[in-house]
Regions:
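N-terminal secretory targeting modules
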Residues: 1-23
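Acidic/histidine-rich, surface-exposed loop or edge segments in extracytoplasmic proteins
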Residues: 24-25, 44-51, 144-152
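Alpha-helical scaffolding within the catalytic cores
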Residues: 9-12, 64-67, 163-168
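Short, flexible loop segments at the rims of nucleotide/cofactor-binding pockets, characterized by
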Residues: 2-5, 27-28, 54-58, 155-158
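Short, compositionally biased "basic patch" segments
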Residues: 1-6, 35, 133-139
Length: 178
């Protein structure tokens, strides 16, 4: 599946790993696949791992990604980057996102809907595999003032994210992962 574009590549790459060879799986948005290095986890802790993060990964995509992971792997540890928990999915956009997440898992054609463009353009994607990790070399400091201040305010998790988070917890418990 070297034609699979960046957003979906970890969905397939994890299935190509030797069965039951991954101790830990990382899920979440771009912060997950640019921040946690499986090579570093191996070097420092002797732990095999794979990053199954996606750009803008939602909680329902995380759930279906984990269902995919558990087809061939039995990781004892799931590391979840939680930015997506607080992403609001409301109105028609929320409905489209929910249906898209379900469709992407069950219908391969939907997941690969843009591969034909790459084939016609003669574009090929590299086969470099860093266990789902992506190097990010364009880091720039934020200079527009304070954006995180400590307060007593509690941010509630949107209901759709909470629904899928509960499903993720049940799935992980069922499969013996923490």
């Amino acid at each position: 599946h070297h034609l699979v574009q960046d957003r979906s590549k970890s969905f397939y790459q994890i299935l190509r790993e030797p069965e039951n060879s991954v101790d830990a799986v990382v899920v979440g948005d771009s912060l997950s696949y640019t921040s946690i290095s499986p090579m570093e986890l191996w070097k420092e802790y002797g732990m095999t791992s794979f990053v199954c993060g996606q750009s803008g990964q939602t909680t329902q995509e995380t759930y279906y990604m984990l269902k995919n992971v558990f087809k061939r792997q039995s990781p004892g540890l799931i590391i979840m980057e939680t930015h997506a928990l607080f992403k609001e999915q409301s109105g028609m956009n929320g409905v489209k996102e929910i249906l898209g997440g379900i469709g992407n898992y069950y219908v391969t054609l939907l997941r690969n809907h843009d591969i034909w463009k790459a084939v016609l353009a003669g574009k090929r994607y590299t086969r470099v595999n860093y266990k789902g990790f992506s190097f990010r070399c364009d880091v720039k400091p934020y200079r527009k003032g304070t954006y995180m201040t400590e307060t007593e305010k509690i941010e509630l998790i949107p209901s759709n994210s909470e629904f899928y988070m509960k499903k993720i917890i049940r799935l992980c418990r069922k499969k013996g992962a923490e």
